[in-house]
């Protein structure tokens, strides 16, 4: 899958020579990179100013790896599934990028601070977040839904195949 200058695909496919390649073997974890919500989040990351990044519900690490290749640093990801954390770490190593993947409950425990938070999870999960970031990219829900993030103003909505992603900026920014 090509998104701007990024290419996301499995290890058995060859990326285009002009692309930043995100090679992903999902293993038992969620996330091959092909879902419309992943594409929407990647489009948002391509347009934002890189800084520190937190990926809530990191799955196989697609968004974290892409962010690291785009210059975001440091990159941290949390997921409730230990198989996802293991897959994210393995995929990051295979892509030669540095990330910090941790098992954590994003809705229950305090989240690490980052300039940008990306959350490609259910609408309920997005609403439960209390991010401490300047910018929040949300997805994982239908176009008929839109999360409300107190203290943030809505900036951009993207839609693809019935799915949506939104970019929010902290009110004081």
Feature annotation, model-predicted:
Residues 1-32:
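Non-catalytic substrate-recognition/targeting regions of SAM-dependent transferases
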Residues 14, 61, 144:
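Surface-exposed, flexible loop/turn segments at secondary-structure boundaries
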Residues 16, 172-173:
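Short, charged/polar, Gly/Pro-enriched secondary-structure boundary elements
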Residues 28, 32-107:
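Conserved SAM/SAH cofactor-binding pocket of Class I
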Residues 43, 80-169:
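S-adenosylmethionine
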């Amino acid at each position: 899958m090509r998104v701007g200058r990024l290419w996301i695909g499995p290890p058995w496919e060859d990326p285009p020579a002009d692309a930043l390649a995100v090679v992903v073997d999902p293993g038992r974890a969620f996330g091959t990179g092909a879902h419309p919500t992943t594409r929407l989040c990647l489009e948002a990351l391509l347009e934002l100013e890189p800084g520190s990044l937190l990926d809530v519900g990191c799955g196989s690490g697609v968004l974290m790896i892409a962010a690291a290749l785009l210059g975001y640093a440091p990159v941290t990801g949390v997921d409730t599934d230990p198989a996802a954390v293991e897959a994210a770490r393995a995929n990051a190593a295979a892509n030669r990028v540095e990330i910090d993947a941790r098992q954590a409950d994003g809705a229950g425990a305090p989240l690490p601070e980052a300039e940008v938070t990306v959350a490609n999870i259910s609408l309920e999960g997005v609403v439960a977040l209390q991010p401490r970031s300047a910018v929040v990219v949300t997805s994982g829900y239908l176009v008929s839904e839109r999360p409300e993030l107190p203290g943030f103003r809505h900036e951009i909505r993207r839609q693809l195949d019935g799915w949506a992603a939104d970019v929010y900026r902290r009110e004081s920014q």
